[in-house]
């Protein structure tokens, strides 16, 4: 084992000098010997003269020059397999739930090659979520990549929690949750909610359905930069066993942000809006590994924070290129009190194709979008001249569009504690039946209030009787 000495410390970036003949490779993990807690450095660059520049996987507080560092000769490796289920781990795969060591028989390096083209699967199957607006307008594919786009406070995490609740329980597959740079409180709430739902079994962790990897907001950038890869590595192991895995990443923007934080310290010139010049490559390395093979599938749902609600920002724009479906959350819809605040006009999916979902579903979804788009165009006229100036046909469009807007809302299981309304899971055929009826004018006589926060169309009819 080669040993070196720390020669420079600048925040999250540390330079280590090794003998010329024993310089570590890029991505090698180095252990700091003097640290009270386990402290790992990951080599990023070889500067010449035996000096390597590293990112600290932890806090560099208290480190000093001259401290000895040992090269492990391999990249960071994390435990994989069933022992990780029901446990909370950090970026290095160490348990942080105070329930003892993970004790896994197998470890994988977090830096792995993406599956080759021959290994990848090309089958298409839909994944029902039970959320009306998603199943109708932007259906998910099994083994696809889904992005939840939204600014601060419009409901990305709540939507993700509901998807975990609906898909993990209905689909009964295994899930890996990677909390990348998000709030510690949300991670804590998630853990206890999963216990209540029976997804995490504290008494017998290996019967759990989810493994959790956290690198929260208060962690140094090295942890936030690599924690997504740690979660993905665990998901890949389950996939290679022939399982269908769900990978939830909250939030992929913080992964980019951590890269931005260390990029300048590594001596790279910033590019547009101050992002790292390697933004597209870093995103590609992560996203290309999230794929389905002939053995099993990884379906990933990623929350994407949109800075200042600007979808053209380089970070969300780079993420867009990799996704099969995009769920866009709109602040204006949230301001109207319509939740989930998913924009049916901005949200897209490659699966919304007559050859995949069928002609009936496709026509219904496009009919809903057409009605809502026409209403959007008429809003200016209504604001200036009022409803009376519209033709009878346009008045009917407005009436139906307002009902559709309200019928797209739905009570969530994970929001029951706030709203007091029990959550509902709406099967796809019920969703289609309701919207087909609305477009055909079958429910023109029902007041629009009846459609607020109901499940199926039958619930709306019941609500109308109470009004």
Swiss-Prot record:
Homology family: Belongs to the ATPase alpha/beta chains family.
GO function term, MF aspect, one: proton-transporting ATP synthase activity, rotational mechanism
E.C. number(s) listed in UniProt: 7.1.2.2
Subcellular localization, as worded in the UniProt entry: Cell inner membrane
Recorded topology in the membrane: Peripheral membrane protein
Protein name stated in the entry: ATP synthase subunit beta 1
Pfam families per record: ATP-synt_ab (PF00006), ATP-synt_ab_N (PF02874), ATP-synt_VA_C (PF22919)
Keywords for this protein: ATP synthesis, ATP-binding, Cell inner membrane, Cell membrane, CF(1), Hydrogen ion transport, Ion transport, Membrane, Nucleotide-binding, Translocase, Transport
Matching InterPro entries: AAA+_ATPase, ATP-synt_VA_C, ATP_synth_F1_bsu, ATPase_a/bsu_AS, ATPase_alpha/beta_chains, ATPase_F1/V1/A1_a/bsu_N, ATPase_F1/V1/A1_a/bsu_N_sf, ATPase_F1/V1/A1_a/bsu_nucl-bd
Enzyme class: translocase
Chief place where the protein resides: membrane
Domain of life assignment: Bacteria
Binding site for ATP: 150-157
Subunit structure: F-type ATPases have 2 components, CF(1) - the catalytic core - and CF(0) - the membrane proton channel. CF(1) has five subunits: alpha(3), beta(3), gamma(1), delta(1), epsilon(1). CF(0) has three main subunits: a(1), b(2) and c(9-12). The alpha and beta chains form an alternating ring which encloses part of the gamma chain. CF(1) is attached to CF(0) by a central stalk formed by the gamma and epsilon chains, while a peripheral stalk is formed by the delta and b chains.
Entry GO CC: plasma membrane; proton-transporting ATP synthase complex
Species assigned in the record: Vibrio campbellii (strain ATCC BAA-1116)
PANTHER family from the UniProt entry: ATP SYNTHASE, ATP SYNTHASE SUBUNIT BETA, MITOCHONDRIAL
Catalytic activity: ATP + H2O + 4 H(+)(in) = ADP + phosphate + 5 H(+)(out)
Primary role: Produces ATP from ADP in the presence of a proton gradient across the membrane. The catalytic sites are hosted primarily by the beta subunits.
HAMAP family, sorted: ATP_synth_beta_bact (MF_01347)
The keyword Cell inner membrane is assigned to this record: yes
């Amino acid at each position: 084992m080669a040993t070196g000495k720390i020669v420079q410390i600048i925040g999250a970036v540390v330079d280590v000098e090794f003998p010329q003949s024993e310089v570590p490779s890029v991505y090698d993990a180095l252990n700091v010997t003097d640290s009270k807690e386990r402290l790992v450095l990951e080599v990023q660059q070889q500067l010449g003269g035996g000096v390597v520049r590293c990112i600290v996987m932890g806090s560099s507080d208290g480190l000093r020059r001259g401290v000895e560092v040992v090269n492990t000769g391999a990249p960071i490796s994390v435990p994989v397999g069933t022992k990780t289920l029901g446990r909370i781990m950090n970026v290095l795969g160490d348990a942080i739930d105070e329930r003892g060591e993970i004790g896994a028989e197998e470890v994988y390096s977090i830096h792995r090659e993406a599956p080759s083209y021959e290994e990848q699967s090309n089958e298409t199957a839909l994944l029902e979520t039970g959320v009306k607006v998603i199943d109708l307008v932007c259906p998910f594919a099994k083994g696809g990549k889904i992005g939840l786009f939204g600014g601060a406070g419009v409901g990305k995490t709540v939507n993700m929690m509901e998807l975990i609740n609906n898909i993990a329980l209905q689909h009964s597959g295994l899930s890996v949750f990677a909390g990348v740079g998000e709030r510690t409180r949300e991670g804590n709430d998630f853990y206890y909610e999963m216990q209540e739902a029976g997804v995490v079994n504290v008494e017998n962790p290996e019967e759990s359905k989810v493994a959790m990897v956290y690198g929260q907001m208060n962690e140094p950038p090295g942890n936030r930069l690599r924690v997504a890869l740690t979660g993905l590595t665990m998901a890949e192991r389950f996939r290679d066993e022939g399982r269908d895995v769900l990978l939830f990443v909250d939030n992929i923007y913080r992964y980019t942000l951590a890269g931005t934080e260390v990029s300048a310290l590594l001596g790279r010139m910033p590019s547009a809006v101050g992002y790292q010049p390697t933004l597209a490559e870093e995103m590609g390395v992560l996203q290309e590994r999230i794929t389905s093979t002939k053995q099993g599938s990884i379906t990933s749902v990623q929350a994407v924070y949109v800075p200042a609600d600007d979808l053209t920002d380089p970070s969300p724009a780079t993420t867009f290129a990799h996704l099969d479906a995009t769920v866009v959350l709109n602040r204006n819809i949230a301001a109207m009190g319509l939740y989930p605040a998913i924009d049916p006009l901005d949200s897209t999916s490659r699966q919304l194709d007559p050859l995949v979902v069928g002609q009936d579903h496709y026509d219904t979804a496009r009919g809903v979008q057409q009605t809502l788009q026409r209403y959007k165009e008429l809003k200016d006229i209504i604001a200036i001249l009022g409803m009376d100036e519209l033709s009878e046909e346009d008045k009917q469009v407005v009436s139906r569009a307002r009902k559709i807007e309200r019928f797209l809302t739905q009570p969530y299981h994970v929001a029951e504690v706030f709203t007091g309304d029990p959550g509902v899971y709406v099967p796809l055929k019920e969703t289609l039946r309701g919207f087909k009826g609305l477009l055909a004018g079958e429910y023109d006589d029902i007041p629009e209030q009846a459609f607020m926060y109901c499940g199926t169309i039958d619930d709306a009819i019941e609500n109308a009787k109470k009004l």
